[in-house]
Structure formats: C-alpha cells, structure tokens
C-alpha cells in the first residue's frame, strides 16, 4: 500500500499524493489515481481500435496521378509500380473470397542510379495508400547469429511505424535499399559463409514470400528474454531498390551472345532512347549475384533512368514539396521573398549532373549556395527580396563568395 511517512496516501503507479489529484481509488494492496485510470483507459481503447483500412480503392491511373505530383519523370516505372500496387491490394481486399486460383504477391525491384527517385517512389506510394511504411538498408543486415541487424528488425520498424498495431503493419510497405550490395561474391556457391551477402538473401526468402515471424519489440539480441510479437508477412508489400553498378555490362554481354546469325541485326539493337537497364532479365540479376530463389520472389522488375538537366530543373520547381518551394517558405518565415532566375536553376541542375548525384545532390548544392544568405538573410536582402542569379551559382562552382557581391547589390537577378 502506498503511504508516505507523514501518513498521506499516494498513487502506486505515478506516485502523486492524494492532494495532487482529483480522485485516489483504493484497492486491497495499492492505490490508483484518476489520471492513471484515464491513461490506462486510453491505451486499452487504442489497442481495441480497428486498424486504418488505407486507400485500397484507388485505380492504377489515380495512383500514378498522385505519384506525378511528387516524382518528376520515370513515367514507365510509375506506371509499373501503380499497377503492381493496385494488384497487390486488390488481392488483399479479396483475400476472404474463396477461390481456386491463389494469387501471389507483387513484390517489386527498382533498378536505377543514385538520385533517380527509387526511395521517393516507395515513400510516396505508402503516403498515397495511407499504410505504414518502413525503410531499411540491406548493407546493415546479416544472418541471424552474427553482428549486425536481423531481418526481423525490419518488421520491428514497420510495427513501430504502425504504432504497434499488428493488423495495420501486416498491410504495410517495406522498402529495402542497396539490395545490390547483398549479392553473393561469385556466381558459384561459396564454401565459406557469406553472412552479409547470400546469407541475407536466404534469410529474406521466407519473409518476402509470406510467413509468420516472431518480432522482438525491444530490438532482439540485447533483450533475449522479452515476449515476441507474431506478425504475418503474407500481405506486406516488399519493394527493393539498388543501383546495380556493372549490370549494364552483363546485359550487353548477354545481348551480344544471343545476337548470332539471322537474328543478329534484330537482337543486337538496343534502342538508343532507352536505358540499358530497362532490358534487364532475371538471368542478368543472377549473374550479378542475386540467388535465383530470391529473384523468383520478386516478379515485378522496373528500371529508373538517369535524370538529365531538364528533368532536374523540373524536380527543383514542379513537385508539391519541391526544393525551391521549401527554401522559399523558409525565407518567407523571415518576411523575405526568395527568387531564382531560370538560368540559375538550370545551372544548379547542371552542377548536379556533373556531380553524378541525381536529384539527391540538389539539396546539397542548394545548401551550399544559400548558406550565407540564411546565416544573414537581412544583410543580403534588397527591398525584401533575395534573388539568386546564374552568376551566383557559377561563382559557387568556382569557389567564390557570391554573398558579398549580393550584399553590395552587384549580382541581383531579375526577381
């Protein structure tokens, strides 16, 4: 029984005195205050709430239209993803209907260079469908029993994203990046244990196909005696992404090998308007180092092309949450208007192409360009405006301090 030395009773859970709460309820061995009762009631109510159903009624065209608002370019990949996701959740909606035909999952593999939009596509899909989303890096995963993350830790991230609502988590999306980094070292089976390559692929097999996994709510190895949460992966959509550097050579070698005799003129022609990666076949990925069983569980494969200057220019200005809009909002909070010349934006896009970082490199360039302006926004403002010109971007490339010129009024754009 909770009683202080002075004889005042207190809550056995939070420790608050009788005088500090509205009501203190007595039990045989303990007291509980009204605040703790309300808190416990809220927790129980949350657990009993039905899981959010998500927007599973969207048609492929509607899904792509929303993707278009956030992801610029990659039209074919957006179409492929929209259809795959629609079919996956259509299968889920009709899971209770008895059918002679069992429809397998539409797990997806996105192949494309850094900064082409793989992660953004997966994240946007989850937002469109209003389902829990978790992201993992394949390079941190190892086989169970070795130093590193277990595959079950990915499911834990999804559970956390769903606020430990198991039903909601079982309809979520998991994106695993850098999957090309877990390719086995050679095409032949290795005698030595490959715990971060083929071993991880083997560990992922059952999870991505569909199984009931025991997930440690506190993260696994550090808490061996905790109770596990059972989660079915039958309806979790897995999306994998990777750059697959060197896959082009494998595709071209296959293409040359099959281009013999009568069919040579037909088969050896790779369309100059299409990226080589768009011709990837499962056999190419096996040669790259993914095991056949792993590839067999990912039926949908699509490639994302490298973004050119014009596309990167559009990435800067067109999406709902474009970088230009984000930085303009930050300056607006200081009662300033941020303006970019079109030539300045094209110069930023050109710099990202030169760095070979795709859309991901745009933010780093913008940060470098605007650092001094954000440090002293009023010092470079002219009549409440901060204007960025092409010359400023070019001076950044040359390592010059364009902020001083802007403050003197020498480099103001046409804003």
UniProtKB/Swiss-Prot annotation:
CDD domains: RecA-like_ClpX
GO molecular function: ATP binding; ATP hydrolysis activity; ATP-dependent protein folding chaperone; protein dimerization activity; unfolded protein binding; zinc ion binding
Family matches, as InterPro entries: AAA+_ATPase, ATP-dep_Clp_protease_ClpX, ATPase_AAA_core, Clp_ATPase_C, Clp_protease_ATP-bd_su_ClpX, ClpX_bact, P-loop_NTPase, Znf_CppX_C4
GO cellular component, one term: HslUV protease complex
Protein's organism: Anaplasma phagocytophilum (strain HZ)
Protein name as it appears in the record: ATP-dependent Clp protease ATP-binding subunit ClpX
Function statement: ATP-dependent specificity component of the Clp protease. It directs the protease to specific substrates. Can perform chaperone functions in the absence of ClpP.
Record has Transport as a keyword: no
GO biological process, one term: cell division
Cited PROSITE patterns: CLPX_ZB (PS51902)
Intrachain S-S bonds: none
Record key words, sorted: ATP-binding, Chaperone, Metal-binding, Nucleotide-binding, Zinc
Sequence similarity: Belongs to the ClpX chaperone family.
Subunit details: Component of the ClpX-ClpP complex. Forms a hexameric ring that, in the presence of ATP, binds to fourteen ClpP subunits assembled into a disk-like structure with a central cavity, resembling the structure of eukaryotic proteasomes.
